[in-house]
Design a protein with these regions (language model features):
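Glycine-rich phosphate-binding loop signature in dinucleotide/nucleotide-binding domains
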Residues: 1, 98-100, 149-155, 211, ...
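Acidic, Mg2+-coordinating phosphoryl-transfer loop and its flanking beta/alpha structural elements
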Residues: 157-197
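Short beta->alpha linker loops
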Residues: 45, 83-87, 108, 133-134, ...
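Conserved H-loop
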Residues: 35, 60, 122-127, 152, ...
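N-terminal helical cap/lid subdomain that shapes the substrate entry/recognition surface
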Residues: 3-89
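Short, acidic loop-to-helix structural element flanking the phosphoryl-transfer center
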Residues: 77-104, 110-114
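A short, structured active-site edge motif that brings together acidic residues
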Residues: 41-42, 123-136
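Conserved Lys-Pro-Asp/Glu-containing loop-to-beta segment of HAD-superfamily phosphomonoesterases
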Residues: 5, 139-166
Length: 216
């Protein structure tokens, strides 16, 4: 396997957005008719898959796109206050310097991501940002990107913090690195059998290097 492109999720993988997202979704709970998340419930929710969370919340699947839109707008007001995951900038810089092409695929807005990257001096590390994907539609965007760039499944790897990131990667047969520092717990991620499960950003360097070594 010769990895050429590493695609990253944004929320929870690159940016520490968990607390902000909980506050925002709690604020919108009454409007969209779902239960708020109490602080003591967060650990249990992190053990659920994305689909289980949607089901448990009781929100109508038809309201999800409208909720996502409002969450993005609300997050825009907080984006300047958010921080990168500790150690992620160093890992990204190393991966970029090794000749990898880095990109972002997110259900957040491109504007939010761009503002965040500029604020933290990360914008030059990424070649592309694809935004606006549905909660469970990332695999379609990745497949289209691969086709447009003549990439095969062995040349692309996805990095994400949620069970749905693993599901999307498996649907199109690309390898996935699950990271336990974001939304879903390591136990929830492990149940979905990612190709790699890591717990610190520096481990990204080791995983990608090991894959390149297999080829050489």
């Amino acid at each position: 396997m010769s990895v050429k492109v590493i695609i990253f999720d944004f929320d929870g993988t690159l940016a520490d957005t968990l607390e902000a997202l909980v506050i925002i979704t709690n604020r919108l709970a009454v409007e969209f008719g779902y239960k708020q998340t109490a602080p003591e419930e967060l650990a249990q929710i992190r053990n659920l898959s994305s689909r289980e969370i949607v089901k448990q919340s009781g929100i109508s699947i038809f309201k999800l796109p409208f909720l996502l839109k409002k969450v993005k707008l609300a997050l825009h007001n907080d984006i300047q206050k958010l921080s990168p995951i500790l150690g992620i900038k160093e890992a990204l810089t190393n991966l970029k310097n090794e000749g990898n092409r880095l990109g972002i695929l997110t259900s957040n807005s491109e504007e939010n991501v761009s503002v965040f990257l500029r604020k933290h001096g990360l914008e030059d590390l990424f070649s592309f940002i694809y935004s606006g994907t549905s909660l469970f539609g990332k695999h379609k965007v990745i497949r289209k990107f691969m086709k447009q760039n003549n990439l095969n499944t062995e040349e692309v790897i996805y990095v994400g913090d949620e069970t749905r990131d693993i599901e999307s990667s498996k649907k199109i047969n690309i390898k996935v690195i699950a990271v336990s520092w974001g939304f879903n717990s390591r136990e929830a991620l492990a149940k979905h059998n990612p190709d790699f499960l890591i717990h610190k950003p520096c481990e990204l360097i080791e995983v990608i290097a090991s894959l390149q070594k297999i080829v050489s």
